[in-house]
Amino acid sequence: MCFNQRILIGSISTEQLNKTIVIIGWIKRIKKLGEINFIIVGDKSGTIQVTCKDKEQIQQLTREDIVIVKAKLQRLDSVRFELINPTIKLFSKSKTPPLIIEDETDALEEVRLKYRYLDLRRRLMQKRLLLRHQFILAIRNWFNQQGFIEIETPTLSKSTPEGAQDFLVPARIRKDCFYALVQSPQIYKQLLMIAGVEKYFQIARVYRDEDSRKDRQPEHTQIDFEISFCNQKMIMNLVEKLFFSVFLDVFQIKIKKTFPVFKFSELFERFGSDKPDLRYGFEIKDFTSLFQDHQNQFTKLIEAKGIIGGIELTNIELSTDKIKALRKIAKDHDVSLEVHNKNNSTLKTSIKCDEKNTLLLVANKSKKKAWTALGAIRNELKYHLDIVKPNQYSFCWVVDFPLYDFDEKTNQWISNHNIFSKPKQEWIDNFESNKNEALSEQFDLVLNGFEIGSGSIRINDPIVQKRLMNSLNIDPNKFAFLLEAYQYGAPVHGGMGLGIDRLMMILNQTDNIREVIAFPKNNHGIEVHTNAPDKIDKEEVKWWIKELVK
């Protein structure tokens, strides 16, 4: 079959010139020019032209057939090679593909997902898979060099009352009980620190039963690590060194050795978000005072102690379509967007604004609501204005997060991060009675407007951990195993989870996480090519019901 003689197309070099070689690949195109046939054959490494004058050899061949080609190598031009006088053998016949298998394809995403195995044949997708592999390999090597050991933690675990909705798995061996697919290796890596491992990492698969988005999937992969006897600064320095090394080795990109650090409150005030894209400006400003002495549509709101925030776009005029898109973002956040420019005179009697500028205004009784909407509008602007350069990577750290967050839907206090994050030392004695002010040892890493990592220094005192759980109305008995472990000499420890999928999305300069995952779910959480989740056999359903209600 000549498999042992095969040469990958991408490895062909001048050393094989004028020699007979063997390639195996898929037919990408067939072009006839008089008596000569030009066949483009490709494998995972590249493509090459095969020039054939023998009609009989190719008359049964079509696009995406696999062929074995034995031919003489020669130059096509100063850069490219071609194969001449070939012997072509059909190895595997292909049906007519339902999509164009080229870097540029006109297939809808649902078609690409249904025939993902064909979509992945595209060289663009092959490059993304390879880049992901090289990235993960470099991460593993770097952690190994730093003295970390990779330890696999369980995927089937215990459902705990924190985080997102669990994926539940019925347990046949224990009646009326369920496993939960882990949302994070959090508890296990803390137990590993108590076990004296000190430096742990893994490339972890984690699961959260939540809606899919462009930057989120129900299952994802993260770089998970934990270290003992550390502080926040040590972890941040470690991550900066990791990314400086990996970006340079894998992507040949030199990033800054240290990342700027911002307080959560500062970022929200300036950008309306705790994950701003710092590649451009457009900071949010308080414009309330400009309207206080004028009768306008904001008068009643100002009298009711409301607030007016805005973003001023210097020397930028927005088209009607762009304004419409921004107003939709505002509407999604349950606020209205006022736009002031030379084409909109609604506010000209109230404020002075340069005719070349555009002012985007949001008014609301709640500053949090107004600023959050403006943050989303600011983020949307980069998709409508030419303000971001390619290959620009802007990292930042976010620190001093609130320990608690108030959920307006349930009218309850919840944990802002997770229930294992340590309160800052100045709040350690009274955080329960100061939920609106208490800060935590949580820190996030942001890249180009996406949260790519979240971590914290953990609680290692069982008394403090119980106090925090009780303040959130969480039964400490649910975590009895962890609280007991804390009583056997628990070191100070901390760590992070860094999202590989989001990182690869950013580095591949695509805006959809599905583009960098081999077999992703669609927007509805469905794996289109297998139709998962799917119904199971009725008899199996009956058996499970019978077992669970025994």
Swiss-Prot record:
Its main location: cytoplasm. GO terms for molecular function: aspartate-tRNA ligase activity; ATP binding; nucleic acid binding. It catalyses: tRNA(Asp) + L-aspartate + ATP = L-aspartyl-tRNA(Asp) + AMP + diphosphate. Gene3D superfamilies: Bira Bifunctional Protein, Domain 2 (3.30.930.10), GAD-like domain (3.30.1360.30), Nucleic acid-binding proteins (2.40.50.140). It holds the Pfam family tRNA_anti-codon. Residues 186-189 are annotated as: Aspartate. Its EC number is 6.1.1.12. L-aspartate binds at E162, R208, H417, R458. It is found in: Cytoplasm. One of its GO terms (biological process) is aspartyl-tRNA aminoacylation. One of its GO terms (cellular component) is cytoplasm. Keywords: Aminoacyl-tRNA synthetase, ATP-binding, Cytoplasm, Ligase, Nucleotide-binding, Protein biosynthesis. InterPro entries: Aa-tRNA-synt_II (IPR004364), aa-tRNA-synth_II (IPR006195), aa-tRNA-synth_II/BPL/LPL (IPR045864), Asp-tRNA-ligase_1 (IPR004524), Asp/Asn-tRNA-synth_IIb (IPR002312), AspRS_core (IPR047090), GAD-like_sf (IPR004115), NA-bd_OB-fold (IPR012340). Catalyzes the attachment of L-aspartate to tRNA(Asp) in a two-step reaction: L-aspartate is first activated by ATP to form Asp-AMP and then transferred to the acceptor end of tRNA(Asp). PANTHER family: ASPARTATE--TRNA LIGASE, MITOCHONDRIAL, ASPARTYL/LYSYL-TRNA SYNTHETASE. NCBIfam families: aspS_bact (TIGR00459), PRK00476.1 (NF001750). HAMAP family: Asp_tRNA_synth_type1. Homodimer. Belongs to the class-II aminoacyl-tRNA synthetase family. Type 1 subfamily. This is Aspartate--tRNA ligase. It comes from Mycoplasma genitalium (strain ATCC 33530 / DSM 19775 / NCTC 10195 / G37).
